[in-house]
Every structure is written in structure tokens, then in C-alpha cells.
């Protein structure tokens, strides 16, 4: 169950609305940020499980591993297949955004993944880094502008706070 204590930064009515998944069907995004252990991955996966229960196609990727695989895909010819798989999902969950530096090719690949989804699929991006720092993290101003335009103009932001939920008794 979701913990709705005052220090968590979660609004029960907003979560209930998000769990109806209208935003997924509309191809909108959710950006989930917060410190380590605040439940970003758990919340993102709750939306993913709910979407799967509604018969929607869901894909989950840790950003650094996805980009590593795509970099290999440039060399072994699997890049198009990887991008097509991600583009076909109704909901793509990109977890641990901002944990490792983006390479120039990683920035471009991330932009392509997000661009493939505009108007056709919803994306959740979860990470510790506040959204206000994403532009600087991406580094390349043109790519950063393009990525931010694709994810934030039609997105809901959830900022989780409070102490770590790991090891907390239920």
C-alpha cells in the first residue's frame, strides 16, 4: 500500500487520479523525483503493474543499462529493434535517470527514444535528480532543450520526500 504521511509529498487524490491511467492513454508523462529510498521505483512500478492489469504494454528500463545496450546496438545492428520495442510500449518506465553521466551518443539515443514516443506513448522518468537540474545534467543545450520539451510540457511531477522507505515495517 502507498504510504500517504505528510512528509512523503504524495497526495492521495492525485495518486488515485493517476492510477486511473488516463495519462497513459493520452500519451502523457510522469516525472518522479526524490532522494534515495523514498519510493520512486516502487511508485513507478505501481503505475506499470496497474497498466499491465488494464491490458496495456509496459516496458521497464534502467536508463544506464538501456543506453549501454543501445550503444552496443549501434555496432551490432540491433539499435532499430531496441528502439522499436520501446516505441511499441504504451508505458515506458525509465528508472534511475541521472545516476551516471550521459555520453554524447547516450544523449542522442535518449532523445530518439523519447521522440519516438511523442503522441503515441506515455513515459515515466524516475530519478534522484530534481527536474530543475536535468538540463545541466544532459549538458548539450540543444539536446537538453529537446528532451525537456518532450518530457516536461505534458507531464505530471511527483516529488517524493521524507526518510527512506527501505526496511520500513508494513
Each model region followed by its residue ranges:
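Walker B motif beta-strand of ABC-family P-loop ATPases
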Residues: 91
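Flexible glycine-/small-residue-rich
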Residues: 6, 34, 162
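Conserved P-loop
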Residues: 10-88, 135-138
